Amino acid sequence: VTGASDPNAADADGEKKVNLGDRKTATIEVKNPKKWFPDTPNLYMVTLELKDSTGKVIEAEAEHVGFREIYKVNINDAEQEQMQITGQKIIFRGVNRHDASLENGSAVTNQEIIDDLKLMKQYNVNAVRTSHYPNAKILYDLADELGIYVYAEANVESHYGAYGDHKVPIPGGDSRWVTPVLDRNMNMLELLKNHASIIGWSYGNEATYTRCPLDNTYCFWAAAMAVLNRDPSRLRMYERESDGYYHRYQKDAGADPWGMETRSKNIVDVHSTQYPEAKNVESYAKNTNYKLPYFEQEYAHAMGQSFGSFNE
């Protein structure tokens, strides 16, 4: 422990204090912590206290954190990749979630969020994508506690406004939108970075419809690099830049798919699609030309008739 009065690491049932004095940063090594998994969402409480010169506490903050490691590995001679959490394969059984209340429209109450996530857990849903904007903090707190993976999505969505035939595509590949897109992505990341349930960042939804240059004039490339440099511990996703669209994934033979050398060449870490048929998913998995692990971003839209024709 850097600058600490007690170098012993805490266990799940214990408590240790770090006295930093005038120091502003600290590194704490926790030995053999209980890991966070969806089935065993072990959490630790981190408490920070700010004291004045007399030792009086003038501000205190507390937040849960969990210990788990997200990464990708090559799984065969073709170097196709797999997402893993602390050595175990990740399989998503997930849903997209919008803030939607029968009584209040988009102004959902805390209790409605609690009911949503408890219902998901009861029906073996283990993942949620916050389509298409950051949610209230209680959702991420509950996901930490209940053991639900979260793909956190930034508030960037424009649909037809992103088409290149517009005078000013929004944002599309127009470099004038780099700063706003970066701002929305990094604000989300800084707000939510301590949540164990968040395993990946999504830069936005359906906001590009043309092939854009992979450089900092393209807002989603700029977001990808900023997110990677600030938080290389999580997966990155943007469905409009999936491997199947432009075939732009780059990885040297034998390279570590989770290494910064590989990831800094690429805008996403996973392949994601919308509304595929089952045969298309199978075809992607069997095609050894595709390397990225697969994330089915959207499948059956419930707007309007609420799955009324799902069977058909």
Where are these regions (language model features)?
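Secreted/periplasmic carbohydrate-active enzymes, especially glycoside hydrolases
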Residues: 1-134, 142, 146-147, 184, ...
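Substrate-binding/catalytic cleft of secreted carbohydrate-active enzymes
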Residues: 127-312
